């Protein structure tokens, strides 16, 4: 007789845990207990789950695991940005980035090893697509970061959600803006985001979880029906010919379809605007005339713009827009009454800035020479 396969409980959201407990002959409330132990108390095994019946703990030992991906390296930038390189097996690695600010801490989470979209200005796409991450590998990034950050700040175990009312949560916002296109890994990303929102797990509000997409129109509609979180769209061009070149997915879902999908999404979104991300490329998409084209393109979509100075990498053949040109471009948008921000480049000395995530372990000597900046590197063993 063959034994049942072992289940990684990190792969299961609340509904999945209830179904799993039912398969063991257990009541639904056991699923909530398990979820709290795993996601709020960082339990690594079942022995310490003292409010579970011993018989259930014994069942779980033989049939389930709480398996996290391994950590290859842990780097801290001079500006406080922290990047983990995560081993997801078969020579694949993904990156997770924490960006601390005065009033919040934002975690940038990866959804795929590599990326098939292959945007011209993004180094991740240049490595090609390896595979989708599992739900465990996605939510595991938040679990790992939250408790690593708590430990580094001397915050004892306990609830990751700050449920004691003391506001102890370190990660206050999650952005699905790491490696990969989240909507092309929908079936793993959505359960992970459900866990991010679940009060028995991480308890984030829908306004504090943002999914960034290059514009997979049918899946935008599906997300709006299933789990509408805050939405960011990687726009980067005001016209189809230019966007076809910068974001090849545009050939399948052109701008007219994308703008219509944004309008539909706003009917159910937790925020009353879409964030359009726009990578500033010298002489490519940064003229004042193109800013006016953007205004015409998005006039029927309540939105804000996040202008992102391009972070160069050798294979791109592109150059970052000059600061004064970014300022002029932004002014055109702001003069029209559109909220516009220019993203401050963070973590570029550890290749953690926007567009730099490539999943490769780089030679740190050459990295330091190239950036002219120091990076604090913490070596950690796989867990």
Curated annotation (Swiss-Prot):
It comes from the Bacteria. Disulfide bonds join 108-354. CDD domains: Radical_SAM. The keyword Metal-binding applies. S-adenosyl-L-methionine binds at residues 180-181, 212, 234-236, 311. Coiled coil: none annotated. [4Fe-4S] cluster binds at residues 115, 119, 122. It is an enzyme of class 2 (transferase). It is found in: Cytoplasm. Pfam families: Radical_SAM (PF04055), RlmN_N (PF21016). Its EC number is 2.1.1.192. It catalyses: adenosine(2503) in 23S rRNA + 2 reduced [2Fe-2S]-[ferredoxin] + 2 S-adenosyl-L-methionine = 2-methyladenosine(2503) in 23S rRNA + 5'-deoxyadenosine + L-methionine + 2 oxidized [2Fe-2S]-[ferredoxin] + S-adenosyl-L-homocysteine; adenosine(37) in tRNA + 2 reduced [2Fe-2S]-[ferredoxin] + 2 S-adenosyl-L-methionine = 2-methyladenosine(37) in tRNA + 5'-deoxyadenosine + L-methionine + 2 oxidized [2Fe-2S]-[ferredoxin] + S-adenosyl-L-homocysteine. Its main location: cytoplasm. Residues 101-349 form the Radical SAM core domain. Binds 1 [4Fe-4S] cluster. The cluster is coordinated with 3 cysteines and an exchangeable S-adenosyl-L-methionine. Its cofactor is [4Fe-4S] cluster. Gene3D superfamilies: 1.10.150.530, Aldolase class I (3.20.20.70). The active site is at residues 95, 354. Keywords: 4Fe-4S, Cytoplasm, Disulfide bond, Iron, Iron-sulfur, Metal-binding, Methyltransferase, rRNA processing, S-adenosyl-L-methionine, Transferase, tRNA processing. GO terms for cellular component: cytoplasm. Reaction proceeds by a ping-pong mechanism involving intermediate methylation of a conserved cysteine residue. PANTHER family: 23S RRNA METHYLTRANSFERASE, RADICAL SAM CORE DOMAIN-CONTAINING PROTEIN. Belongs to the radical SAM superfamily. RlmN family. Specifically methylates position 2 of adenine 2503 in 23S rRNA and position 2 of adenine 37 in tRNAs. m2A2503 modification seems to play a crucial role in the proofreading step occurring at the peptidyl transferase center and thus would serve to optimize ribosomal fidelity. NCBIfam families: rRNA_mod_RlmN (TIGR00048). This is Dual-specificity RNA methyltransferase RlmN. It comes from Paraburkholderia phytofirmans (strain DSM 17436 / LMG 22146 / PsJN).
């Amino acid at each position: 007789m063959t034994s049942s396969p072992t289940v990684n409980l990190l792969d299961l959201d609340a509904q999945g845990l209830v179904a799993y407990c039912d398969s063991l002959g257990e009541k639904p409330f056991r699923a909530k207990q398990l979820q709290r132990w795993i996601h709020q108390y960082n339990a690594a095994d079942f022995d310490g789950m003292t409010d579970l019946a011993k018989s259930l703990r014994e069942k779980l030992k033989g049939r389930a695991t709480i398996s996290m991906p391994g950590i290859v390296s842990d780097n801290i930038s001079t500006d406080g940005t922290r990047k983990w390189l995560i081993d997801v097996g078969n020579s694949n690695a993904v990156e997770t980035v924490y960006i601390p600010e005065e009033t919040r801490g934002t975690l940038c989470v990866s959804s795929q090893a590599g990326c098939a979209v292959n945007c011209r200005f993004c180094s991740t796409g240049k490595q090609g697509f390896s595979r989708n991450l599992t739900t465990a590998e996605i939510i595991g990034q938040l679990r790992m970061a939250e408790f690593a950050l708590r430990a580094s700040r001397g915050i004892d175990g306990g609830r990751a959600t700050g449920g004691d009312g003391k506001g102890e949560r370190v990660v206050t916002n999650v952005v699905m803006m790491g490696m990969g296109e989240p909507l092309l890994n929908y079936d793993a990303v959505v359960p992970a985001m459900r866990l991010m929102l679940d009060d028995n797990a991480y308890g984030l509000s829908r306004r504090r979880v943002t999914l960034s997409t290059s514009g997979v129109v049918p899946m935008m509609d599906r997300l709006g029906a299933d789990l509408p979180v805050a939405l960011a769209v990687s726009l980067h061009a005001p016209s189809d010919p230019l966007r076809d070149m910068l974001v090849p997915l545009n050939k399948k879902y052109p701008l007219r379809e994308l703008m219509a999908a944004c309008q539909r999404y706003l009917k159910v979104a937790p925020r009353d605007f879409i964030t359009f991300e726009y990578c500033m490329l010298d002489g490519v998409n940064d003229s004042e005339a193109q800013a006016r084209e953007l205004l015409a393109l998005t006039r029927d979509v309540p939105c804000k713009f996040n202008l992102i100075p391009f972070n160069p990498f050798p294979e791109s053949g592109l150059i970052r827009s000059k600061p004064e040109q970014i300022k002029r471009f932004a002014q055109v948008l702001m003069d029209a009454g559109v909220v516009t921000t220019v993203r401050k480049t963070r973590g570029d000395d550890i290749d953690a800035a926007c567009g730099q995530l490539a999943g490769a372990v780089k030679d740190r000597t050459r990295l330091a020479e190239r950036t002219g900046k120091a990076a604090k590197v913490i070596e950690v063993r796989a867990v």
